[in-house]
């Protein structure tokens, strides 16, 4: 979501994990854990929290490394990370829930629900569905400054979105013609949800998605507990001479002190939570995975129909780098891979996350890490090499 990649990240080659998956040789949980521990030991990432879902339950969850380097607080399944764009799965789930409740039509113009949605008109208007699957034609402006320190006031949400739309009124393509990722489209969806329900995006999501799933520690603010039991600190590997430029690139108060080869980030929030604002841990994120692996039902509670869940996972428009469903996507490199999967990544300043489901295997993986970038592919490939039961 926020590309910040100045400096050197001593990542680990993705080949080891991919070789495991391609060879098809099952590995033990112990071997998988050793692989994940090595990511910490080699400096690929300060801390990782990982969970696995099989069928309708979480079968494994563990933390590796540190949630906070200054205090040596360990990363755990309960450690909260800023989800960034992984939030879009929640936003899409919320929109589909409204559609199934008869509150909106996915194929109706989005402007019918959010009157502030004004763009230079094409022959056909932008629909809600096209916002969900990134085929609206909306631009994707760099969101590097769409953040604020956690102690700064939250701006007027609607006014913020209207200002962005005023700057990007001209669509890049005819709606529905092709797919191109747009954070702005999901900001508009957040306003659609708010206009329809009369509640804020956060209030609706808490009441209709997070609370029914028992995701009580997941929300839109950082927990008050110490790091490890609370929130992870995000890090960016950065050469020291670049530190002043890095501070200037982000809003004042977001970039924190240096810690060894890293720059730490102070707690911050995104402006417009519908595109990337959820804060939570892998332990509770598995409940969202269970919902999408089990036809819209989790712990005996149905939030979506099986048809709606299938529609979200059905990949239709093809984009330049990814092919999209409603919320979910997959990269071009994943076409034809087995087992097939859909996913959503979430990355920005100090954090990189992935939520991936393998519907044919009834398997789901959530990985959260507190560095701007790391190789999640080898991690996922290694995890699915375990014969989960």
Language model regions located:
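Short, conserved catalytic-motif segment at the N-terminal edge
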Residues: 23-83, 103, 113, 163-171
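Short, well-ordered beta-strand elements
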Residues: 341-344, 352-371
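Catalytic tyrosine of NAD(P)H-dependent dehydrogenase/reductases that use a Tyr as the general acid/base
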Residues: 81-84, 179-181
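Short, gly/Ser/Thr-rich active-site loops of penicillin-recognizing serine hydrolases
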Residues: 321, 337-339, 367-389
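N-terminal amphipathic/basic-hydrophobic helices that include classical n-h-c signal peptides
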Residues: 1-19
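Short, surface-exposed loop or secondary-structure junction motifs
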Residues: 68, 121-347
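Short, glycine/proline-biased beta-turn/loop segments that scaffold the active-site neighborhood
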Residues: 106-120, 211-213
């Amino acid at each position: 979501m926020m590309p910040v990649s100045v400096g050197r990240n001593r990542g680990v080659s993705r080949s080891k994990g991919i070789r495991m998956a391609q060879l098809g040789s099952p590995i033990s949980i112990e071997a998988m854990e050793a692989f994940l521990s090595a990511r910490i030991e080699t400096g690929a990432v300060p801390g990782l929290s990982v969970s696995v879902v099989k069928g309708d339950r979480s079968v494994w969850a563990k933390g590796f490394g540190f949630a906070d380097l200054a205090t040596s607080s360990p990363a755990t399944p309960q450690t909260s990370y800023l989800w960034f764009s992984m939030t879009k799965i929640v936003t899409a789930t919320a929109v589909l829930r409204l559609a199934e409740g008869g509150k909106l039509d996915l194929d109706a113009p989005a402007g019918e629900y959010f009157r502030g949605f004004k763009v230079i008109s094409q022959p056909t208007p932008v629909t809600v569905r096209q916002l969900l699957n990134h085929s609206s034609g909306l631009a994707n402006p760099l969101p590097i400054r769409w953040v604020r320190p956690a102690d700064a006031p939250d701006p007027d949400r609607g006014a913020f979105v209207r200002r962005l739309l005023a700057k990007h009124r001209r669509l890049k393509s005819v709606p529905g013609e092709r797919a191109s990722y747009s954070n702005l489209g999901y900001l508009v969806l957040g306003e659609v949800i708010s206009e329809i329900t009369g509640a804020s995006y956060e209030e609706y999501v808490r009441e209709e998605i997070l609370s029914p799933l028992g995701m009580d520690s997941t929300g839109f603010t950082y927990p008050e507990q110490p790091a490890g039991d609370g929130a992870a600190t995000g890090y960016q590997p950065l050469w020291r001479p670049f530190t002043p430029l890095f501070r200037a690139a982000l809003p004042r108060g977001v970039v924190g002190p240096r810690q060894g080869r890293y720059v730490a980030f102070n707690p911050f929030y995104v402006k417009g939570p519908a595109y990337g604002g959820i804060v939570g841990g892998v332990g509770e994120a598995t409940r969202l995975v269970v919902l999408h692996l089990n036809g819209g039902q989790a712990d005996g509670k149905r939030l979506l129909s099986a048809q709606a869940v299938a529609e979200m996972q059905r990949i239709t428009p093809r984009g330049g780098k990814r092919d999209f469903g409603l919320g979910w996507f997959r990269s071009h490199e994943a076409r034809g891979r087995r087992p097939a999967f859909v996913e959503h990544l979430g990355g920005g300043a100090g954090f990189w996350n992935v939520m991936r489901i393998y519907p044919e295997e009834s398997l789901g993986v959530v990985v959260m890490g507190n560095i701007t970038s790391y190789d999640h592919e080898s991690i996922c490939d290694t995890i699915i090499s375990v014969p989960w039961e």
